[in-house]
Amino acid sequence: MATPATESVQCFGRKKTAVAVTHCKRGRGLIKVNGSPIELVKPEILRYKAFEPILLLGRHRFVGVDMRIRVRGGGKTSQIYAIRQSIAKALVAYYQKYVDEQAKKEVKDILMRYDRTLLVADPRRCEPKKFGGRGARSRFQKSYR
C-alpha cells in the first residue's frame, strides 16, 4: 500500500552564480536556510532582504507551510537575493498547486508590484576576460614609439 504523497513543491532562485533551492511543504511555518532558522541569516544588514517576501505577504500566508532552503555558490549578497527569490517563487508555486488560483494571483501581484526580481531572475552574468588586456573590456596601453 502506497503512502499518501505530501503536498510539496520545489523551486529555485538564482543571482549571479548563487543558487537557492526551496522545498516547500505543508507544515507549521518553519523557514530554515541550510539547516538554521532564517532569523539567523548572515550578514545582519541583508537579513531583511531575505525577509522581504514574508514581510510583504504577511506571516499568515506562511503559517501553513514549512520551507527548507539549500543555498550554495556566489557571495553573501548574491545568496541572500537567491534565497528571497526562491522563497517567493516557492510560495507562488505552492498556492497554485494546492490552494486556489485567486489566492495565487493575489500573492503574485503583491510581489510583482513591489519588486520584479522576487519572481524573475536577473539575466546579467560576468563577462569573460579576453586577451590583450587585464579584464573583459580594458586593454593594455598602446604606444606609438
Curated annotation (Swiss-Prot):
Indicate yes or no for the key word NAD.
no
Q: What is its main location?
A: cytoplasm
The signal sequence is none
- What processes does the entry annotate via GO biological process terms? maturation of SSU-rRNA from tricistronic rRNA transcript (SSU-rRNA, 5.8S rRNA, LSU-rRNA); translation
The family database entries (PROSITE patterns) matched by this protein are listed as:
RIBOSOMAL_S9
Pfam families per the UniProt record, alphabetical = Ribosomal_S9 (PF00380)
What family does this chain come from, according to its entry?
Belongs to the universal ribosomal protein uS9 family.
**Under what name is this protein listed?**
Small ribosomal subunit protein uS9
What is the species of this protein? Answer: Fritillaria agrestis
What lineage does the source organism belong to? Answer: Eukaryota, Viridiplantae, Streptophyta, Embryophyta, Tracheophyta
Gene behind this protein: RPS16
